[in-house]
């Protein structure tokens, strides 16, 4: 799996950073892409990447502020002509997301050639799809804003080729049966698949947060995450000011990383008041502090393996 950032700015785009959008590539579990938020200009950012709109089969919206949704109507209509024909799409988000999309399409007389399933969240959500579990919880942003916890399926153990050759089974289609099933039959005998592969590995846990100031639900979403993606609109200055505007200060994020035992954290939604050089300078300063946890300030088009 890997995650790509198509927008890392907060509120407004800058010359260097677009508004919010994150793509989660589900390979090797599937060839699908899940998109989290679709700020203005997202489809233009995607044109500069190898991701195809037709591979996006889920869109998760954290909240209804414009820097997270203004790119939706254009992206949805373009998907009709870029590999999305007859490919179902699921859109999950706060109440109002369906009305926003359908009103935009109706008033612009836009017509899609694929079906959309809408799931609107009230307070929380437990969603299951192809072995993935997605948990959504309400955050604290002044309007309904959600964080998402994605738990990937268990990865089957690696095939022990030499052990299978030991019973006369050479590499071929049968190996997929060994990998995915508890038992397999070969030459009239039934074998336990676990005897011919390594231990299964738990899938990674990824937590992706919408805009928020510190709140209790953050911990539940972030705990023991292999990767956490969190906003830090304010990467310096007065923490009270950040919280007054229902946003997080970098110190808030650091506290969450430590309390929730997060392995790796990527910081996005950095205020548009900072240019790239200023972001880099503040990052370098924070990195020198021995008490800082493992973190990184992301830039547009950054991609990270999970």
UniProtKB/Swiss-Prot annotation:
Q: How is the cofactor bound?
A: Binds 2 Zn(2+) ions.
InterPro entries assigned: Metallo-B-lactamas (IPR001279), RibonucZ/Hydroxyglut_hydro (IPR036866), RNase_Z/BN (IPR013471)
A Gene Ontology MF term for this entry?
3'-tRNA processing endoribonuclease activity
Q: Does the keyword Protein biosynthesis apply?
A: no
Pfam families with a match to the protein in the record: Lactamase_B_2
Cofactors, names only: Zn(2+)
Q: Active site at which residues? A: 67 (proton acceptor)
Give the signal peptide, or none: none
Provide the reaction this enzyme catalyses. Endonucleolytic cleavage of RNA, removing extra 3' nucleotides from tRNA precursor, generating 3' termini of tRNAs. A 3'-hydroxy group is left at the tRNA terminus and a 5'-phosphoryl group is left at the trailer molecule
The residues listed in the UniProt record as binding Zn(2+) 1, with positions renumbered to this chain, are 63, 65, 141, 211
Q: State which Enzyme Commission number(s) the record gives.
A: 3.1.26.11
Q: Enumerate the UniProt keywords alphabetically.
A: Endonuclease, Hydrolase, Metal-binding, Nuclease, tRNA processing, Zinc
Binding, Zn(2+) 2: 67-68, 211, 269
Description of how the protein assembles with itself and partners: Homodimer.
Q: What's this chain's function?
A: Zinc phosphodiesterase, which displays some tRNA 3'-processing endonuclease activity. Probably involved in tRNA maturation, by removing a 3'-trailer from precursor tRNA.
State the family it belongs to. Belongs to the RNase Z family.
Would you tell me the protein name for this molecule? Ribonuclease Z
Supply the source organism for this entry: Staphylococcus epidermidis (strain ATCC 12228 / FDA PCI 1200)
Name the gene.
rnz
């Amino acid at each position: 799996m890997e995650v790509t950032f198509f927008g890392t700015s907060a509120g407004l785009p800058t010359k260097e950073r677009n508004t919010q959008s994150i793509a989660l590539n589900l390979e090797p579990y599937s060839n699908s892409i899940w998109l989290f938020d679709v700020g203005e200009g997202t489809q233009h950012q995607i044109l500069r990447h190898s991701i195809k709109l037709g591979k996006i089969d889920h869109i998760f919206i954290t909240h209804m502020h414009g820097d997270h949704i203004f790119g939706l109507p254009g992206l949805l209509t373009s998907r009709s002509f870029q590999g999305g024909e007859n490919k179902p799409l699921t859109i999950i988000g706060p109440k109002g997301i369906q009305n926003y999309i359908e009103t935009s399409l109706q008033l612009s007389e836009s017509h899609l050639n694929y079906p959309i399933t809408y799931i609107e969240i009230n307070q929380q959500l437990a969603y299951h799809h192809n072995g993935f579990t997605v948990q959504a919880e309400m955050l604290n942003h002044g309007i309904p804003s959600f964080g998402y916890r994605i738990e990937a399926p268990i990865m089957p153990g690696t095939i022990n080729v030499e052990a299978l050759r030991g019973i006369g089974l050479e590499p071929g289609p049968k190996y997929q049966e060994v990998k995915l099933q508890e038992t397999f039959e070969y030459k009239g005998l039934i074998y336990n698949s676990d005897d011919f592969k390594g231990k299964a590995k738990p899938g990674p846990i990824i937590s992706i947060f919408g805009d928020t100031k510190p709140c209790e639900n953050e911990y539940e979403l972030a705990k023991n995450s292999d990767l956490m993606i969190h906003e830090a609109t304010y990467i310096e200055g007065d923490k009270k000011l950040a919280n007054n505007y229902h946003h997080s200060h970098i110190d808030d994020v650091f506290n969450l990383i430590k309390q929730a035992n997060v392995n790796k954290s990527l910081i996005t939604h950095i205020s548009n008041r900072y240019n790239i050089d200023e972001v880099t300078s503040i990052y370098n300063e924070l990195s020198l502090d021995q008490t800082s946890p493992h973190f990184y300030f992301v830039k547009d088009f950054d991609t990270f393996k999970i």
